[in-house]
Regions:
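Short beta-strands and strand-loop turn motifs
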Residues: 57-60
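C-terminal catalytic lobe of FAD-dependent flavoproteins
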Residues: 62-180
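Short Gly/Pro-enriched turn/cap motifs at secondary-structure boundaries
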Residues: 7-8, 35-39, 98-100
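Small-molecule pocket liners
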Residues: 13-15, 45
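Single conserved hydrophobic/aromatic residue that forms the stacking wall/gate
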Residues: 1-6, 10-11
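Short, surface-exposed charged micro-motifs
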Residues: 1, 46, 109
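Conserved FAD-binding catalytic core of PHBH/FMO-like flavoproteins
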Residues: 22-55
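Active-site beta-strand termini and strand-to-loop segments that position acidic
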Residues: 19, 49-50, 111-113
């Protein structure tokens, strides 16, 4: 299973910053209904207000595995202030990063090899899709379900990928270009 996953998935970082508590007036202006948002960029950004009234802004601003956390926070704070100029003077007090498993087809996969059941490749949607796919595997194991549509998704790899993602700097520049022209 480890060999399979290693040849079909790249591990990347995603980053988050969180602001100080915002005034109720500013909260209502930024997100009147308190919803979660995603943009449509290749280097996607996502944001929402936290239950205690802070702005949470996250994204993958490059494909590096060694971006400094402070540098990432600086990039993200510029991005959020571009989208929300009202946050120009807002202080961002928290930042962190986490690992993502991204498959070449950008789809999660489940399956079984030699009696070992697996699921991987959530690509940044881990909490919701992992819960769902865990339930799928549980139903398959208990016999309550015969097949899952996720088992039907063909596993993809690239002939040039041997666990060394040497191509990612080129892909990052390409995605940055696509974001720039759109």
């Amino acid at each position: 299973v480890v060999r399979l996953v290693g040849s079909e998935m790249c591990i990347r970082d995603s980053y988050i910053i969180v602001s100080d508590v915002l005034s109720e007036k500013l909260q209502k202006k930024l997100s009147p209904k308190g919803r979660m948002f995603y943009d449509s960029k290749w280097f996607i950004n996502y944001f929402r207000l936290t239950p205690d009234g802070r702005m949470l802004w996250g994204g993958r601003n490059n494909l590096s595995t060694d971006l400094d956390l402070e540098e990432s926070a600086s990039i993200l704070s510029r991005q959020v202030r571009t989208v929300f100029p009202d946050l120009e003077k807002t202080t961002f007090t928290h930042t962190w990063t986490g690992k993502l498993g991204i498959t070449f087809d950008l789809m999660p996969h489940i399956g079984e090899i030699n009696g070992i059941h697996y699921t991987f490749g959530y690509g940044g949607h881990g909490l919701s899709i992992a819960t769902y796919l865990g339930t799928e595997i549980g139903l398959l194991l208990s016999g309550q379900k015969k097949r899952s549509p996720f088992e039907e998704i063909a596993h993809q790899t690239m002939f040039f990928y041997k666990k060394d993602p040497w191509f990612l700097p080129f892909a990052a520049k390409y995605y940055q270009f696509l974001d720039w022209i759109s």
